[in-house]
């Protein structure tokens, strides 16, 4: 026997979607702040010398929270390196796109790079790619790919600067922008 809906069609209910309630306690950390602290640790000691206990202490997160937020230590390292690259690119992109004379652009680019390398709460931090990522790239193909991609992007940006300078007569016509960039 089939029961008929006793409610008239004009009075049909509409269901309003409700966001599911999160279970457990609210997050006691800010992911971007924690990632920044992990980045500082990895820059200081590299991947191998930075323990999960170090990361836990610096971020204020216990191990399960670290794993839940960022995955394992390698994934956290990769996310920290991606953050480093994104921050560096954001700091320099306008300079690379600027049409100032090449000398002034290069001076500004290297000034920003020095600010990135020499700033930090605990003193100079250096270049993350040179200091730690390059050594990790030897053993890890994913990190190697990221390092090579980052260097290729940088070479491409410098080549574009030199190409524009050559077009504006700031460099001789025989100057090869790609060679100068490398």
Q: What does each of the following model-derived ranges do?
A:
Residues 2-4, 33, 37, 41-75, ...:
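Helix-turn-helix
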Residues 4-6, 125-134, 157, 174-182:
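Hydrophobic alpha-helical segments that form the core
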